Amino acid sequence: MAFDALFKPIEIGNLTIRNRVVSTAHAEVHATDGGMTTERYVKYYEEKAKGGCGLCICGGSSPVSIDSPQAWWSSVNISTDRIIPHFQNLADAVHKHGGKIMIQITHMGRRSRWDGFDWPTLLSPSGIREPVHRSTCKTIEEEEIWRVIDDFAQGARRVKEGGLDGIELSAVHQHLIDQFWSPRVNKREDQWGGSFENRMRFGLEVLKAVRAEVGDDFVVGLRICGDEFHPDGLTHDDMKRIAAYYDATGMVDFFGVVGSGCDTHNTLANVIPNMSYPPEPFLHLAAGVKDVVSVPVIHAQNIKDPNQASRILEGGYVDLVGMTRAHIADPHLIAKIQMDQTDRIRQCVGANYCIDRQYQGLDVLCIQNAATSREYLGLPHEIAPSDGPKRKVVVVGGGPGGMEAARVAAERGHEVTLFEAADQIGGQITLAAKAPQRDQIAGITRWYQLELARLKVDLRLGTRADEATIADLRPDIVVLATGGQPFLSQVPEWGYDEDRERSLVVSTWDILSGAVEPGKNVLIFDSICEFAGVSAADYLADKGATVEIVTDDIKPGAAVGGTTFPTYYRSLYEKEVIMTSDLALHRVYREGDALVAVLENEYTGAQEERVVDQVVVENGVRPDEALYYALKDQSRNKGQVDIEALYAIQPQPALATLDDDADAGFVLFRLGDCTAPRNTHAAIYDALRICKDF
């Protein structure tokens, strides 16, 4: 078959992995309780094993010591024997589906915060401040070094006693082990610093202690960085030397290799490459390490497509491929390949909604798959057909919520008609994909196009549904996903040009859609600070405009996630876009052929002016709810959603009334932005939890 390389089993130590695909270690925020794995945690990994993933490495940055705090992502706490029975439940859930599971263990040293959990004193080889967390730490003392080494050994013991298949020691992204490796962090002059051998000593002693505790048959891997990409950091040649050194000990069963350090905001963006990066941008680093070691090498960074993964393996670059975000988007991707259903794989688009939520201390969710990480609630990845009557379902609006509503209703076996006023489905995704760094987000729409065609949804494009259109179909259920429209009328002072009969300001939608030609000297005012404002700035600068983006927030793009805003800032700085904070757009007026934008400082009230030829405003959207109010009184439930049932992921009570009185009208629901403007995930989540019980 075309994917033979993916399905070839491999030995790691004494462990046989059924295929070459790995879900690598990452944080599973809010899936633990006091550091203990929960039902949510177990179900999340069980779904991946059920879907065919060969190896799951769970527990990104799981601490071995109480002075390596769990940080904001609530990682697994392996510093106590209380974790052992929790591991046993996790191991059983994965093993019964033929998968293998390991956990990443670490001491994060200085790369954490001191002001949470037990308020620890952070440790580092030389007490040098870590910039991203703004944490100043103490220089670790000899006695503490040996205590932490033993903590690693005891953590490994707990993993083994819990029935997991191995551990991955984290020596990447400036955790304590690689802090000792780094001359820019390790300034010691004792046996733990200075020479190469001395800087390697801490990691070596950790390996010795771990092996003494778990024996030679238990799998122990080492995750490393192939190049820190820092002026004073460890280079690729340095890392190959380090890998070869530890490989020669015979105590390492595999290496996980990724590119880039992450102790600055800029380098953090490299670690989990978003859609602006090319495929597998750091594969050459893993391949370089593979050349100097004798054990299997795993690489994971921007490997999202099975054809891409197969090509990497066939080329011999690495031995296993990490497809972590790909499994967040679709935990059944391996099973779909095996069933020759690759076109049904919900492919990751690199939006980084998952990881960016983690860095905000929120649970890890997928922008397009609302069932991921909610398996414990009963939200399904595969929609089962209804065992009730076949219904007529009308969906109005072909954005994210409407596409998901139509898909889920059709999977349930109902007759579904989807109306979309535009000539294509996609809604705001279509706009987002026009921005320079966002084109891959169109993959969400492409997947829905294939699914809706497979399910034979009656797709009526270029058709604006109204009361009569809907009445003609005599539906049982109507779902409104009509979205929203740019909200430009909030401030009348933004102005209206009587002579030209149009607003003095235009929206980011106008710019990205091409409805309005870009100006040459443009001011963008962004009060929302999500993707639209910085995307419009990037787009306009690409078109040759001189651009200033102004916000009344702390910075432009303030709500764009931690792995994503740096790529925008790189681009905007390179294109000489001016970024200004703390100014609100107070007034716009015309002066001859120019526009004058009056800006007001949020803190002092002082005003300043910009003279430009175009003012672009990003002020969010307002619900497009006219059709809802036109239909509300015709519906049997008056358009109301039972919020207790919604939040409990239970069927909507109104659905049970459909067989009571055939003349009582249809059941009406609205979801997504036409209820309250939010985001793509919210619209899809609304649709799944409402429509799964049709």
From Swiss-Prot:
Presence of the UniProt keyword Oxidoreductase in the record: yes
**Notes on temperature effects:** Optimum temperature is 60 degrees Celsius.
- pH dependence text: Optimum pH is 7.0.
Q: Which residues form a coiled coil?
A: none
Q: Phenotype upon knockout?
A: Disruption mutant loses its ability to grow using DMG as the sole nitrogen source but is still capable of utilizing sarcosine and glycine as the sole nitrogen source.
Q: What is its main location?
A: cytoplasm
Task: Supply the alphabetized keyword list.
Answer: Cytoplasm, FAD, Flavoprotein, NAD, NADP, Oxidoreductase
Top-tier EC class? oxidoreductase
Cofactor requirement: FAD; NAD(+); NADP(+)
Disulfide-bonded cysteines: none
Instruction: Give one GO term, molecular function aspect.
Output: oxidoreductase activity
InterPro entries reported for this sequence: Aldolase_TIM (IPR013785), FAD/NAD-bd_sf (IPR036188), FAD/NAD-binding_dom (IPR023753), NADH_flavin_oxidoreductase (IPR051799), OxRdtase_FMN_N (IPR001155)
Q: Does the keyword rRNA-binding apply?
A: no
Q: Which reaction does it catalyse?
A: oxidized 2[4Fe-4S]-[ferredoxin] + N,N-dimethylglycine + H2O = reduced 2[4Fe-4S]-[ferredoxin] + sarcosine + formaldehyde + 2 H(+); oxidized 2[4Fe-4S]-[ferredoxin] + sarcosine + H2O = reduced 2[4Fe-4S]-[ferredoxin] + formaldehyde + glycine + 2 H(+)
Indicate how activity is controlled. Ca(2+) increases the activity by 12%, while the other metal ions tested have no or slightly inhibitory effects. The chelating agent EDTA inhibits the activity by 33%.
Subunit relationships = Monomer. The purified enzyme exists in the form of a monomer, dimer or polymer under non-denaturing conditions, but only the monomeric protein exhibits enzyme activity.
- The protein, known as: N,N-dimethylglycine/sarcosine dehydrogenase
**Species of the source:** Chromohalobacter salexigens (strain ATCC BAA-138 / DSM 3043 / CIP 106854 / NCIMB 13768 / 1H11)
